Amino acid sequence: MTQRGEVPDFLHGCGLPAAWAGLPQWRILETGFGFGLNFLATWAAWRADPHRPVLLHFVATEAQPVSAADLLRAGSARPGLAPLAQELSRQWWGLLPGLHRLRFDDGHVLLTLCLGDWQAQLRQQRQQLTVDSVYLHDLPQDWRPQRHPAPAGLPGLPGLKAVAACCRRGTRLASRCSTVRDALVQCGFTLHPAPGSDAQRDMLHAVYQPHWQPRTMRPAAAPATPGECMVIGGGIAGAATAASLARRGWQLRVLDQAAAPAAGASGLPAGIFAPHVSADDNLLSRLSRSGVRSTLEQARWRLREGLDWSHCGVLEHRADASPGLPARWSDGPGADGRQSAAHAALGALAQSGLPANASVCWHPQAGWIRPARLVAALLAQPGIRWQGACRVARLRRVQAPGAGPTAWQALDAQGRVLAQAPTVVIAAGAGSLELLEHRWPLQPVRGQVSWGLHGDPAAPLLPFPVNGHGHLVPRFPLGDDAQGPCAWVMGATFERGVEQMPPAPADVQAAHASHWARLQTLLPRMAPPLESAFAAARADAGLAASARAAQSWAAVRCTAPDRLPIVGPVDAAALPGLWVCSAMGARGLTLALLCGELLAARLQGEPLPIEHRLAKALDSGRM
C-alpha cells in the first residue's frame, strides 16, 4: 500500500487552510487512509493556523489498516510530521472492521476511521455526515470504471456516488485520479483541472455543484452555533456531556441536588472500565470497545496515573466457561495482536492464581478509575459552571417575546427558577425519571459494593482488577500518595426496582455475603487476605463498623429495559431543545464519555463517533 502524491497538493487543492478560517468546525473525507500522511499534514496545518476552526473532523476510509510500525515509519520520514505520527501510532490499536473515533489535541482534532466495507458505512452515515472537503485517493492510471471494478478500498462509480452523497453544494475535492473525470461529472462535480507536481498527471480540482436536486441532499446549514445549555446531573453522564459541549464552545451550567459533584452512583470508591466481549461480537461488545477508547483518552489527558486511575489491564474470569472473543478475529492491528494478547493472558492467569484451565480473557486496554476524580476533572474545563445544592423538581418551557427562541427553565419544588437556557440535557441518573415525567419505562437499580483498607500497604497484591462474576479492584490509593493508605473494592449488587437509601442493615449484610461468595469463585487467591474483613463485617452487624471490617457503599443507578444508555432528544418536534443522556446502568465508566460525545455530535450535526446502527440503538426514539 502506498500513499500517492505530494501531501500538500490535497490540502491546497481543497483551498485549505484558508477555507476553514474562523469557522466553528471543518469536515474532511479521505478515501484511502494509507499511511495517514494526508491526515498528518492536515493536522499540522490546523495546528499552525491561528484562524483554525475549533473542531477539525477528518473522516477516512480504509480497506485494511497498516501496522502501527509502518504508520510511524512513513510519518517520521516527513519533516515536521514525526511527533504527530507518534501520537497517531499510540492510538493505533483495536482497529477491527467498523467505525473508530480517535481524538487528538484535547478532543479538537477528531479522526474517524471507516474500516472494511467503507462504502456501506458511508451510506449508513450519510444522514449525519456532510463534508466540506474530499481527498480522493488515486487509482491505477489504466483503470476505467466501465471495464474494471475499483481495487479494494478505492472508489469506483458506486463509491463515488457514496462520496457525493456525503457532500454539500460547494464541497471541494482534490485528486490525482484523472481516470475518474467522467464518473465525477456523473456524480454532480464540476471539474477544475490544475497542474500537479507529478509531470505525468494533473491534479484534479472539483466542486460539488449538481444541476439536479439529489434525493439524499441535506440542507447546507451551518453547524449549530454553540450557546447556553443546562445539564441536570453532576455525575459521570452529566460531566461527560458538559465537557463534550464545552470543548465545542458552549457555555454550560451543571445543576445537581448535592453540594458537590459525583454524590450519587459516580461516588463509587473505585470502578473498572473494560470492554464487553461476546462470541458473536454483539452490539454491546462493539459499543463498549468505542466507550473504552473514549474513557482512556480522557483519563490520559485529565487524571494522574497511579493515583486517580491505572491503565493496568483487566483480567476477565469467565467462570461459566462461556466463549469469549469471536473466532474470526485475527492477529494484527485489528485485534490488538491476538497472539500477544494470548501471551499476556497467560501471564495474568499465572499471577491471579487461577487454575491453568480457567477460562479467561485479558483486556490490555482497560483498568480502574476513581470516578469522582474523573467527574471533577471533566467539570473543571473552561465554560462549565457548577451549581450545586439545588434540586430541580421540574422543567418548564417558555417562549421568548416575539419570534425569540424557546427556552427551558429549571424549577425547584416551590416553583422558583434555578436556571434557564435554550438547551437542556437531563443526565440525572435515577432522578431522570421524575424530570421526564415518567414518560419512559426507566428502572432504578440499587448497587452495593464492599470495600476496605489494606492493613499493609506494601503487601504483594494482584496489580490489576478481575471481573466476570462480579468485579474486584485489589488495590487503589485512597488519597494523593501512591505509597499511602490503599483500599480494595468488590461488587456490585444489581437490585432492580430498589431505591431505598441508605440500605437497611439486613440488606448491607446480604450484600457483603453475596460479595464474599462471589469473590471465592472470581478470584480464590484473594479470599484469604480479605476473609477477616468480611468476617468482621458480619461480627459488627448492627454495630459501629470496626476499622478492619469491610465497609458498605451504595447508590441508585438507572437502566432502560434493554440495559443500553439513552442518548438523544426527548421529543424533537414537540419539545425542541430538551435532550437526555442517561441510563448508563453499571457501565458508566465504560460508556458515559462516549455518550457525551455522541450527544454533542448529534446536537451539532457532526459526524457520529460510532456506527449509525449503534447510535440508533441508543437513540431516545426507541423509548
Curated annotation (Swiss-Prot):
Question: Tell me, what is one Gene Ontology molecular-function annotation carried by this entry?
Answer: oxidoreductase activity, acting on the CH-NH group of donors
Q: Where in the cell is it found?
A: Cytoplasm
**Keywords of this entry:** Cytoplasm, FAD, Flavoprotein, Methyltransferase, Multifunctional enzyme, Oxidoreductase, S-adenosyl-L-methionine, Transferase, tRNA processing
**Record-linked Gene3D superfamilies:** D-Amino Acid Oxidase, subunit A, domain 2, FAD/NAD(P)-binding domain, Vaccinia Virus protein VP39
Top-rank taxon of the source lineage equals Bacteria
4Fe-4S listed as a keyword: no
Q: Please list the GO biological process terms of this entry.
A: methylation; tRNA processing
| Any one cellular-component term (Gene Ontology) | cytoplasm
**FAD-dependent cmnm(5)s(2)U34 oxidoreductase: where is this region?**
232-623
- Give the region (tRNA (mnm(5)s(2)U34)-methyltransferase) as residue ranges: 1-209
- For whether the record's keyword set contains Membrane, the answer is no
Q: What cofactor does this chain's UniProt record say it requires?
A: FAD
Q: What is its EC number?
A: 2.1.1.61, 1.5.-.-
Its UniProt entry gives the catalysed reaction(s) as:
5-aminomethyl-2-thiouridine(34) in tRNA + S-adenosyl-L-methionine = 5-methylaminomethyl-2-thiouridine(34) in tRNA + S-adenosyl-L-homocysteine + H(+)
Stated role: Catalyzes the last two steps in the biosynthesis of 5-methylaminomethyl-2-thiouridine (mnm(5)s(2)U) at the wobble position (U34) in tRNA. Catalyzes the FAD-dependent demodification of cmnm(5)s(2)U34 to nm(5)s(2)U34, followed by the transfer of a methyl group from S-adenosyl-L-methionine to nm(5)s(2)U34, to form mnm(5)s(2)U34.
Against NCBIfam families, the record matches this protein to: MnmC_Cterm (TIGR03197)
Q: What PANTHER family is this protein classified in?
A: SARCOSINE DEHYDROGENASE-RELATED (PTHR13847), TRNA 5-METHYLAMINOMETHYL-2-THIOURIDINE BIOSYNTHESIS BIFUNCTIONAL PROTEIN MNMC (PTHR13847:SF283)
Q: Which family does it belong to?
A: In the N-terminal section; belongs to the methyltransferase superfamily. tRNA (mnm(5)s(2)U34)-methyltransferase family.
- Per its record, how is this protein called by name? tRNA 5-methylaminomethyl-2-thiouridine biosynthesis bifunctional protein MnmC
Organism from which the protein derives: Verminephrobacter eiseniae (strain EF01-2)
